[in-house]
């Protein structure tokens, strides 16, 4: 299926690793032009090179998105280079374990900057360009905004905020035909996730307990499965879809708990 994304300029935050990288490569395969935004330019450039190996075009933008000025500069770089923005994927973030007992005011606010506030700022600064292109926004979110996890107050609050902003923006941007949707991720296999698993005492046993709780095929979601949904939502093939929280999670959040293996 041709998603009609050829030469569309799409900004992807956290585009150098994991889900973001998979989205960048999926966009490139559709002929789109990804703007790879990440905190380490060396990592950004590696993914840019992968895009070029596919015969595509991309730019790499170094930005620490917890700094508001970097958000503005990242969008400006895309506009200075291409003169347009057709899509925005807000993806960057990290479950940093700021809990109710273990956290602090400073840690909680810092986590909101790392995980939520730049979602707003990137969309805010890209808005005029998205109005001009009648573009699309995809927010990557997490099950922690829905299910609770424990010891992750700030990240859960950020994901609840991401989901709320998705529907708020979908309403606000109706007059401009800008569609806004979110992809809710549960357990996705990424290098960051694998690094976390390896810090545990029994990584293989823990991973099996996790996958046993994923109803569809008892396996992790892949980054490519998230990416495939993202490029569809960015494309005009989803032209009447807005304000939706799309769960790409193997049934983790909503299917009956009785399906869990004992």
Task: Pin down the residues of each PLM region.
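Short C-terminal tail/terminal secondary-structure segment
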Residues: 147, 231, 242-262
């Amino acid at each position: 299926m041709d998603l009609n994304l050829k030469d569309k300029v799409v900004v992807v935050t956290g585009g150098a690793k994991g889900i973001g990288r998979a989205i960048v490569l999926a966009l490139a395969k559709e002929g789109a032009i990804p703007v790879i935004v990440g905190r380490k330019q060396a990592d950004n450039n590696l993914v840019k090179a992968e895009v070029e190996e596919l015969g595509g075009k991309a730019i790499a933008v170094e930005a620490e998105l917890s700094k508001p000025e970097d958000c503005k500069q990242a969008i400006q770089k895309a506009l200075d280079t291409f003169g347009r923005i057709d899509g925005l994927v807000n993806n960057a973030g990290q479950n940093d374990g700021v809990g109710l007992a273990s956290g602090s005011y400073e840690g909680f606010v810092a986590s909101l900057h790392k995980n939520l506030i730049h979602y707003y700022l990137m969309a805010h600064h890209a808005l005029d360009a998205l109005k001009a292109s009648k573009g699309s926004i995809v927010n990557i979110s997490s099950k922690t905004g829905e299910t609770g996890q424990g010891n992750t107050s700030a990240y859960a609050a950020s994901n609840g905020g991401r989901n709320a902003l998705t529907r708020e923006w979908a309403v606000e941007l109706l007059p401009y035909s800008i569609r806004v949707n979110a992809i809710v991720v549960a357990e996705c296999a990424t290098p960051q996730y694998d690094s976390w698993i390896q810090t545990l005492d029994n990584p293989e046993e823990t991973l099996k307990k996790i996958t046993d709780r994923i109803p569809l095929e008892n396996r992790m979601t892949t980054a490519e499965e998230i990416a495939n949904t993202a490029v569809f939502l960015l494309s005009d093939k989803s032209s009447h879809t807005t304000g939706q929280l799309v769960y790409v999670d193997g049934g983790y959040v909503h299917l009956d708990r009785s399906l869990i293996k004992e």
